[in-house]
Amino acid sequence: MGEKVVVLIGPTAVGKTKMSIQLAKRLNGEIINGDSMQVYKGLDIGTAKIRQEETEGIPHHLLDIKEPHESFSVAEFQTLARSLIKDITKRGKLPIIVGGTGLYIQSVIYDYQFSDAPSNDLYRQSLERCSPDELYEQLKQIDPLSAERIHPNNVRRVIRALEIYHCTGKTMTEWLKEQKRQLVYNVALIGLTMEREKLYARINQRVDQMIDQGLIEEVKRLYEQGLRDCQAIQAIGYKELYAYFDGMLTLKEAIEQLKQNSRRYAKRQFTWFRNQMPVQWFDMTDDTIFERRVNEILHYIEGKFHFQSNM
């Protein structure tokens, strides 16, 4: 088994950032971002990216490494995160991956080989003659989950997903799910959960806070730069307000849609994590026992790795 790695997962707004700082302080850890949208510069408020003053001196990696117009793939994330795990471990620190993008996190800790996906040159050439819109429409029909992750203009990735379906009869989502997977690290997989009613209330409250903190102005800056056909703008919080700036929605409708999409995303995250990985769950519904939960998680990690934290 490889290096020791803590993975902290959970749906949006469950409290991962606050918990990750406490764990990193007591475990001599460094944090690796595991959210596919926090890699983008300028997408700060809408992605709930940690602010410098909130880090409490804990090093954070894989934040702000891409311009909004650039694409970012799960294979690229895998390479960068694994390199960081090696580097952080070599310096005597503990890598802690924190985030909500399930496939990205899975790709790092399991032995995913993206190059093993089947291919068909003739079929690919026939797809390359189609327009991006035609390709994306095909993908939406056969694999809506992949269509949510892949921007319509990321033609290479859309074609890859269609190619896998053509060769195997399985969607890329199903194909990845069925790969025989082995953990490549000694992993402590921690999940934070919360009663749905409270989580949804927190999500709604967080959206209101984002608006107060300047989300509309943040999205307007991107909109005015002409950034439109790029992966970053598909993020929840950005696509809804783009519809407002395009005159398709009123501001009230855009904000309501943002809340609804965030709640749906949280539900999908829960489903993914519960079905895909052997997670040790900790319920964060009761705010008054936060410190007790920190200690319970530390105790679990100590048992898993056989070492003592700075509790």
UniProtKB/Swiss-Prot annotation:
Site, as annotated: Interaction with substrate tRNA: 101
EC number: 2.5.1.75
Family matches, as InterPro entries: Dimethylallyltransferase, IPT, P-loop_NTPase
Pfam families per record: IPPT
Binding site for substrate: 12-17
Segments for region (Interaction with substrate tRNA): 35-38
Catalytic activities: adenosine(37) in tRNA + dimethylallyl diphosphate = N(6)-dimethylallyladenosine(37) in tRNA + diphosphate
Chain sites annotated for binding ATP: 10-17
One Gene Ontology term from the biological process aspect of the record: tRNA modification
Any one Gene Ontology molecular-function term assigned to this protein's record: ATP binding
Family as reported in the entry's similarity comment: Belongs to the IPP transferase family.
PANTHER family named in the record: TRNA DIMETHYLALLYLTRANSFERASE
Quaternary organization: Monomer.
Annotated function: Catalyzes the transfer of a dimethylallyl group onto the adenine at position 37 in tRNAs that read codons beginning with uridine, leading to the formation of N6-(dimethylallyl)adenosine (i(6)A).
The protein's name in its UniProt record: tRNA dimethylallyltransferase
Native species: Anoxybacillus flavithermus (strain DSM 21510 / WK1)
Lineage: Bacteria, Bacillati, Bacillota, Bacilli, Bacillales
Gene: miaA
